Amino acid sequence: VREAIAAVVLVILHFFFLLFFFRPALTTPDANSYYVMTRLIATKGTTECRPESPLQYLGPHWKCLRDNAYYCSHAPGISVLCAPLFRSGGTGAALLLTPLLASFSLFLVFMIVRMWMGPRWGLPAAALMAVNPVSNEHALFQDSHTAVCFFLLLGTYLLLKWKMKPRAEIAFFAGAVWGIIPTVRYAEVIFPVAAMIYLALHIKTEKKALFSILSFLAGMAVPIVPLLIRNQLVYGAFWKTGYMVTGEQHAFGWDYFTQYYPVYLQKMMSEGCAFILPLGFLGIVLLFFHHTTVKEGLLFLLLSVPTTILYMAYYWPPDPQSMRFLLPTFFIYTITGFWMLRVLVGHDRRMFLGTVLTLLALSAAWGIPLSLSALGHLKGTGSVLTDVTSMLEKNAEPGSILIACDGISQHVDFSGRWRLTEMKSVESLFSPEQKNSTSSPPFSSEILLRNREGRERYGNKSGDELMELFRRDVWKWAGENGKVYLLLKKEQCSAFERHLAAGEGLEKIDEIYIDLPSPPRRGGSHVKPPFPPAGSRSGDAMQRPPPEGPVSQPGPNFSLSPRLFDLSLDSEPLLLMRWKRK
């Protein structure tokens, strides 16, 4: 009981620790993908987006399939879970789900280890993951990896519970939990396959195993069948996913694996698991040498090694966020690593205290500074975006047109409060003469415009012809009494002002400073990868932006200002200007 109370206290403290850094903001293209889909499900009951105008902004992961219907390339599972929170509490409530799942995952680690190894081992294992920097950062990154970890742990707990009490209802709920995982991330379909293999291994030794497997499959059908039906309706085949639109199925190869696996192994030690990683690997191996734990050894092997190899073979080179792909395996290595410690320590209390306290001290010395650094940066960028939102809520009427860069639009898009323009469709109108816009790094020119109608309408236009077409479309979209606002840097507003006709002008409404200290650079340089791997592609296939923003040039450059996707977070303010006309 004391250990359980201590675990609950740890979960509460961890959640409040995350809340200190939490800001209701979307700082990545992936987050825009999941949470705009959340809004669409909550307000319209669909994952489909139909732009009202060729100017309408669409996030980087939204692709047109047919008849001006756009769908996100990501799985909708996390969006379905967040939709009720959005309806009841707005954007902030929906964004709280991920940190909640991150903290609850610690309790699941405690429950798994305590049930499997004894009461004294659960709390140290949970504490170890509480200081893991990748887990803590992605608790506030608003992507899908934390949710996968939660359901992986819950599913593992139910499987081990089933082994102790092989009842059909436990198998059914386990199947439902494991079935949620591929609805959250398509590639993680290998996890429920591992769970099914684990159950199948018990057919010879457990009389009720076959019936439990059928119950497990019935449980899996609850979340997976709706996903397959959606895939059939949206993509024309139940086995197709949004990744096929972007050619992701061609993004894996042996050449990538041989080039990247040494870096991944290094990063797993330095950024991912640190000291528990070798213990975790050895623990999985040692499980095979005990006849009572062979099945668990195979389960944990299948939950860790295949997904690690898969992402090592992915075309995108290792970067500061690559460890997010392997985050679920860190929980597995922690569980098996503590099992290894238990074998080494046995029942000696002094050895238990010495080894566990040493491991926790080293892990804390490694993980806490990295966690504080990553979370502090997220807090800073999130504060910038929430401040921008507050300024817009104060000055820009709901439903008005807003022209802003992608770094702002991908966040503001979640609320649906304003109508956002795809600024890159007409970017030349906002580019100062003789130099590029400060908010448009070289990477931005490589991203195809998402709004297909806008790409066709404005793609070959320039100068006065482009401005006249833009003027006509934006005011048609705004309506007779609508208003149009710009939220851009001064030089961009000045460049646009030169294109205005007589009787038009820009009225300054407000300004906001978006300065942010440069974040510490972590290992790995961002080098543009060769994609598509299978050759050039047409249509809406696009080069995937890294999760934290544009690719920087290789090598250290400490003079660069920090960026929020394509927005330079320097000392120059963003100006909120109203486009006025007679």
Predicted regions and their residues:
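Membrane-lumen/periplasm interface segments of multi-pass, membrane-embedded glycan/lipid transferases
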Residues: 55-66, 232-288, 312-313, 320-323
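Short helix- or helix-capping micro-motifs
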Residues: 10-11, 98, 122-133, 157, ...
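Short acidic/glycine- and proline-prone juxtamembrane loop motifs at membrane-interface regions
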Residues: 134-147, 409
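Perimembrane helix-loop-helix junctions
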Residues: 158-167, 191-224, 228-229, 284-289
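Transmembrane-helix motifs of polytopic, lipid-linked glycan transferases
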Residues: 93-117, 154-158, 285
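Membrane-embedded, lumen/periplasm-facing catalytic core of multi-pass transferases
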Residues: 355, 359-410, 435, 442, ...
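Signature aromatic-anchored transmembrane alpha helix within multi-pass, membrane-resident enzymes
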Residues: 1-12, 120-123, 176, 197, ...
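Hydrophobic, aromatic-rich transmembrane alpha-helices
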Residues: 104, 200, 270-301, 305, ...
